[in-house]
Amino acid sequence: AEVVTDEWWFGFEQEYFFTNPDGSPLGWEKGEPRPQGDYYCGVGADNVSGREISEAHLDACLAAGIHLTGTNAEVALGQWEYQCFGKGIKAADDLWVSRYILYKIAEEFGVGVNIHPKPKTGDWNGSGMHTNFSNEEMRTNGSEELFSAMCDKLGEVHAEGIAAYGSDNDQRLTGLHETQSIEKFSYGISDRGASIRIPIANVENNWKNGYLEDRRPASNADPYKIIAHIVGTLTK
């Protein structure tokens, strides 16, 4: 899309599960593990499974010139996330290639990758691809009115956004597990249960310098469609 210039910055939070050859999540070989709670950003062999694969992927992406800004163990055992930053359409290019590299690295370790938004039913978090974004005005001349107006614009086309944000997302966006219901749209400051989270840093910066986090995209979403929807909506 020609409107997507390097003025637009994107940070994708790609979540996924490492899987065994039988399709079960890594670390679930003896059946369902204890309830989630200790796994998020966890340490220790009883709390984490697959760190060496995640770190090999990080190293490979950095060597390829892809700007990963971090990785972390996620809420469920065997679930991971990495953050991929880029400017303009290159953000989607890099996210797409980073996924390819992830599958290749995982293959070398004899495991698979599952980017379905809800691979395990029950009281387990799904996998999303929260999309953080900003443009020049948001970073240098923001205001509470500006950020609220942007959220309202995205809310007006919520159905179109959901259509662009990946398949089977209804299984993840239930209103539970740090999500808003797929049927509803909301935004709020530091609200992990909202469709759009307004970072507390925006408030701390007196709204002059900030960004927004769209929490609706699924882990299997097409990053080009996400960018096209966000920029297309906010530049109308």
Q: Predicted regions span which residues?
A:
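Glycine-rich, acidic/polar active-site loops that bind/position phosphate-bearing ligands
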Residues: 1-236
